[in-house]
């Protein structure tokens, strides 16, 4: 459900951003940097799980039988009977409920701008395949 192979992209992007900041003279706090990478990866995982959940509800992954795995058709764990739609919903909810207070803590450590970024990330992660936004059907994802 979380599609770990793609989570590496998020981790690399965060580490690159931390490295650029350090090169520009903004040496990172190791704990804050590590927390940033972990939370970014978990947020990406939450978005993937939300996508699998909503695609199962709207039938998008069921209809995608000719897709190029792993790039289309989701993780296929629901479709192959390994997890239920409810399990997927519960994991997405647990990840989000964990991420919100952790993200708020990180924002307090680093500045309020992170709150806006986190809220936009949650909105886009949810809105990618969830109604009423369903951004993927609008060519926005």
Task: List PLM regions with ranges.
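Membrane-helix interface segments
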Residues: 28-31, 60, 85-86, 112-113
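Aspartate-rich (DDxxD/NDxxD/DxxxD) Mg2+/diphosphate-binding motifs
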Residues: 47-95
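Intramembrane alpha-helical segments
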Residues: 74-141
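Membrane-interfacial segments
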Residues: 24, 54-58, 111-114, 134
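Topogenic membrane-insertion module of multi-pass membrane proteins
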Residues: 1-31, 35
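Membrane-embedded alpha-helical segments that form the functional core of polytopic membrane enzymes
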Residues: 22-50, 116-126
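Residue-level recognition of pore/gate-forming positions within transmembrane alpha-helices
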Residues: 14, 40, 67, 96, ...
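Membrane-water interface at transmembrane helix exits
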Residues: 17, 21, 25, 47-51, ...
């Amino acid at each position: 459900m979380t599609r770990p192979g793609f989570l590496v992209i998020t981790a690399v992007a965060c580490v690159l951003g931390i490295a650029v900041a350090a090169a520009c003279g903004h040496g990172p706090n190791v704990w804050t940097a590590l927390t940033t990478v972990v939370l970014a990866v978990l947020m990406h995982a939450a978005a993937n799980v939300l996508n699998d959940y909503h695609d199962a509800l709207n039938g998008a992954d069921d209809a995608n039988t000719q897709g190029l795995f792993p790039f289309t058709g989701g993780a296929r764990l629901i479709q192959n009977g390994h997890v239920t739609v409810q399990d997927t919903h519960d994991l997405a909810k647990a990840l989000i409920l964990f991420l919100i207070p952790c993200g708020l803590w990180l924002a307090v450590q680093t500045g309020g701008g992170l709150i806006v970024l986190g809220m936009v990330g949650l909105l886009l992660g949810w809105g990618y395949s969830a109604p009423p936004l369903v951004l993927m059907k609008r060519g926005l994802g």
